[in-house]
Amino acid sequence: MATLFKAGPDTFELPKTHCYTRFTNMQTDTALKAPVIRGVRYFLAHTPGLVQHGSKPSRDLLADPGLAADLTSHLRSFTDASAYLPNRAFLGGIYPDDLLKTARPWHGQKGESSRWNPHGELMPEEEFYGLLKIADAFDLVWLDEDFTNDVAATLAGHPLVSEDDLERLGQGHPHSEIEERMAETGGGLPLQLRCGRTIGCIVRAHDEDATLTPDVLLENLACKASAAMALRSLLSETSTAPEDIPYVINCGEEAVGERYQRGGGNLAKGIAEMCGCTEATGSDVKAFCCGPVHAMVMAAALVNSGVYQQVAVVAGCSLAKLGMKFRSHLDNDQPVLEDVLAATAILIGEDDGVSPRLRLDSIGKHTVGAGSSQQAIIKCLVSEPLDRLGLRFQDVDKYATELHNPEVTEPGGSGDVPLLNYRMIAAMATMAKEIEQADIPQFVEEHGMPGFSPTQGHIASAIPFLGHAVDRIKAGEMERAMFLAKGSLFLGRMTQLSDGMSFIIEKNH
């Protein structure tokens, strides 16, 4: 027995099995451990049938049901989505700079179509619906019994789906039961394929709780399922046993909770459970689009301090952003490109002598008092961290910033977001007298990259390039890369401030 404290004649003790006296999966040697990026994996699910449930489409379709036919006719096939060059770049099939060699529009190019890529997979919508049911712990997902039989046979061949998963998939429901449930007021949200076939529904979890309605539950289950697949892929790729993960940080945009705690959170633990990480605990980090960079810095600090040997950072999808720009895509008679859900998982561990190091001595942060101008933000995130290391702007091989695919954003008037950021970084380099004004285009081409990420908010912020950077640094083709993200905190109406954070990874010497 371990003595906790003593008062008078009575001694209060805790059993040795109490969590205060156990240090399983925690370091007892707190000597500083240099953190490295041991692995990075991505996951995409092609979900054209879910586009109607994105925030913008769901509102517009409610106001104008006649839009449905036009929207449906502009949804892509799985073959087109898997051949789409930005999707292939996101999954490591091509290097982002290769996009510069291909004329736009990229959606008009008919190239190689592959589900499996070096950094992850693009899953068809049928299988993702099955995954939603596997992630469901409260019988919220009702799938048609015929559809369930078909998808079970397909998922049985997936290398990351287990027998236990198939058991959780269950037998499904008769289609008549699903129709009856959806006919009830607020009873269920339909789950449909691209072709319009209804294969199930999401039911509400509470009759009165507005945070447990079908649309919110669908959003949260999609985030959980996508993040879990990214983490499973990461564990497999790095040959890491699930029980060897002691801590998981989730940095998705979901808000899991109930009416008394609308964002109560800790989806991290649910994701860990779905991946068999029985010795893990975890927590969620929220910072709008800047969340993943904050989470990576925290994970690196936990490893560096010796608290944990390794930490997994996960970020699930943002279903609300499906079809966010669909009206401008319809106006331009182009495919609805926001038809994929994206997730990522990153493993940060102790220095192994090979993996790229994350430099904790050069973290950039946008402080409360820094000001909200773009120049002030870039100064905090780029100039000051470089100054601390005695580096020039050109000493960074690649800058990864907001990597939104311009083919998605430009038709709606949002411009080429990555290009604007790279021009700002180049302008700061001119102010530092490192390059001339005339050299800005060359600097942008050499140290920037075209946007290629799905517009999934936090997912698009810098992290999509991490897998490419790790590959190139380990191959000796790159020395260092900087990752910077910004967050629009003012959208939540609690502050007028923006946010930002950055870090540098470099070759392990």
Can you name each region flagged by the protein language model?
Residues 2-221, 328-393, 446-448, 495-509:
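Condensing-enzyme catalytic core mediating Claisen C-C bond formation in acyl metabolism
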Residues 223-282, 286-287, 392-423:
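Conserved beta-ketoacyl condensing-enzyme motif
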Residues 311-317, 481-486:
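Short beta-strand segments
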